[in-house]
Amino acid sequence: MSSARERLEGAQVWVVKIGSALLTRDGVGIDARGIDGWCKQISALLDDGKRVALVTSGAVAEGFRRLGFTERPDSIHELQAAAAVGQMGIVQAYEKSFRHHSRRTALVLLTHDDLSDRQRYLNARGTLRTLLNYGIVPIINENDSVATDEIQLGDNDTLAARVASLVSADVLVLLTDQEGLHEDDPRVRPDAPMVSERSAFDSKLDDMVGSGTGALGRGGMVTKLEASRYAARAGCHTVIANGREQDILSAIANGRNVGTILTADVAPLDARKQWIAAQVQNAGGITLDAGAVKAVMERGVSVLAVGVTDVHGNFGRGDVVRITGPDGVEVGKGLVNYGAVETDLIKGHGSEAIEEMLGYVDEEELIHCDNLALSQ
């Protein structure tokens, strides 16, 4: 067993994405038996102490079937209507199946904008992590009934990768109607060897995936590779596997050589901090006293309001701010939980005083250590 497969055995936070072709039996209708099987396997993962978020496709495809569409319509409003109709069937099927295993579920509808806007990102992050901590299975889909570009792209693979980053997942599982990633299109070349394990950033993979897409789900292997790279930047491994294979999730959890594993190059926390440090512009900054700088640098703790001496700029909740010490030297960057006005009010005060001063408490930390990228 490879070291990457061994790490899957210890994965605690999972994001599982099920594609349209699987859920709707290639457009015939909702695969109730398949859903029962996946829900049973997810329930088993929960029994083992794992936390699992489920990203589902299939709403638009199921809507096509219910509305009698034989071809994908060009009208965005027809697509939105199909999504609204199909979503009902998908959610009801999951709820019914999970109920058989005494599992609670929650519906979370997102658009990519929700994850790009830092304030909404923090709200989504907090909600999803709370659900996972309570042992609830979040059933996540794009809000296709109001979205536009998301429907046209059909990019739930990318949504799943963003969710994996959002909840600091250890593994992202993309269940599809293929055994994994092959060196060539298996529908054209049936004997094409399957890739067992590669780095997500292996450039040879680009030539292998080509540009093909399925008829029902718009995201083929190209988007799955792109999604794996997004997840890898957050330190999350990706497994592409055949959702129709019996007990496929259990096999992955046990480290069996199934599907294709695309590995991340860094650990999750390091990847998150690299992303914060390198890719997001600073909206402002805060200055820490010497004691706070020492605690953050030496012990890796969160930034608390009590250690802040000055506030710079006009940043909002969820923005990236530059953190400096009393000498002006940069300590790091981080995603801040309070805006500049609120931070200025609570600076120098302990966490217990936040509610009294603001009238509410979002987070006890000004910047959580998970969202803090140190410069030294």
Show the residue positions of the predicted features.
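C-terminal catalytic "cap/lid" subdomain
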Residues: M1-Q376
